[in-house]
Amino acid sequence: MKNLKPKIEKVLVKTINDYAPFKGNYKAYMENNKVMVVDTDPEYEDKGEEWFFVPEYDHEEAYCFMCDGGYGWELVNPCEANYPSYDFEEDLDKNFKEAGLFCEPYSSWKHIVTEVSI
């Protein structure tokens, strides 16, 4: 089975960094299987906040990403967010598709990612 974890991480980081409301204000990066996001405003001493967790396949017996609360959870669950917007979810789906992947919610905190077979 092909390791999809690097692609999942790349898509999540790219989507956050390219998302219009965040562009220039936040920077996403990977650290220890976590998608961390830092506020780039020099006035804040932001050490980064975990928005998503991308486990190894063996952890969940599926390639996936998880979000247990926080702003990452709100972005992928817009119908339950305080300030709902479907734009991030649409951008994420588009970026997964461009990477040859398909993402579907398993639950509000876990999204399964599979490779698209053509």
Give the ranges of each region predicted by the language model.
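Ser/Thr-rich, low-complexity intrinsically disordered terminal regions
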Residues: 31, 105-118
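Acidic, low-complexity, intrinsically disordered interaction modules
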Residues: 39-107
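Charged, low-complexity intrinsically disordered tails and linkers
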Residues: 1-66
